């Protein structure tokens, strides 16, 4: 059931306004995508969809989802460029089974009916980054860990800055849940989608875990 003035009832534009975020002023056609890197490379497909926290982009290769982000302009352009470089191909507008499954599962996450994701992922990065991203996916729904705890779990307590950097390089929001990592003192720290969204996601998971799947706008 839709609760008036709750995020589920707000359009992306309304949420951005309520959260004090700038309006989205672009679509997929606004981005400058690079040239095809090889004659036989398969393009990455990019699909834009709406969520209770505003528009999101999902990118997928033939292997799986390689990007899932809130629409935040400069960060998106930087990540698109990096993704094209890493996969030696270009991004074009389109959908495949992976983008459709990701959109469906994210919708279920926001509805409070999904806590684990099944969509295939394709995460190009360094060995250390992939290790950090794998560890992020082991953080239980509704829980949080500090950067120090994350480094400890990786067996490298001194690697806090490196861990934070790998978290920041994560291109798959929510599914690879970097929003569950907080400061040692419990404070919210940087999040590519903005601290308002990070707070919302954490509160949403707590409410769902406690049996209340009707989120309130902060």
Where are these regions (language model features)?
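Basic nucleic-acid-binding alpha-helical/helix-turn surface characteristic of O6-alkylguanine DNA
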Residues: 15, 20-158, 204-218
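…primarily DNA-binding HTH/wHTH and HhH modules…
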Residues: 184-218
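Major-groove DNA-recognition helix of helix-turn-helix-type DNA-binding domains
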Residues: 171-175
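Append "Primarily bacterial transcriptional regulators
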Residues: 11, 150-151, 182
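Short cysteine clusters
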Residues: 178
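Major-groove recognition helix of helix-turn-helix-like DNA-binding domains
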Residues: 163-169
């Amino acid at each position: 059931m839709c609760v008036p003035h709750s995020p589920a009832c707000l359009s992306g534009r309304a949420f951005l306004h309520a959260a004090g975020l700038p309006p989205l002023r672009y679509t997929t056609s606004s981005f400058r995508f690079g040239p095809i890197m090889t004659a036989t490379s398969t393009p990455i497909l990019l699909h834009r969809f709406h969520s209770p926290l505003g528009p999101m982009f999902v990118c997928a290769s033939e292997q799986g989802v390689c990007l899932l982000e809130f629409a935040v302009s400069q960060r998106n352009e930087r990540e698109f460029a990096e993704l094209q470089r890493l996969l030696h191909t270009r991004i074009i507008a389109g959908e495949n089974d992976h983008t459709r499954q990701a959109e469906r599962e994210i919708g279920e996450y926001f509805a409070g009916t999904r806590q684990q994701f099944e969509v295939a992922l394709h995460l190009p990065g360094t060995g250390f980054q992939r290790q950090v991203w794998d560890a992020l996916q082991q953080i239980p729904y509704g829980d949080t860990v500090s950067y120090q705890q994350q480094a400890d779990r990786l067996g490298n307590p001194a690697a806090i800055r490196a861990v934070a950097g790998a978290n920041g390089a994560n291109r798959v929001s929510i599914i690879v849940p970097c929003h569950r990592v907080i400061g040692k003192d419990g404070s919210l720290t940087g999040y590519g989608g903005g601290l308002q969204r990070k707070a919302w996601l954490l509160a949403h998971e707590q409410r769902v875990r406690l049996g209340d799947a009707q989120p309130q706008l902060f």
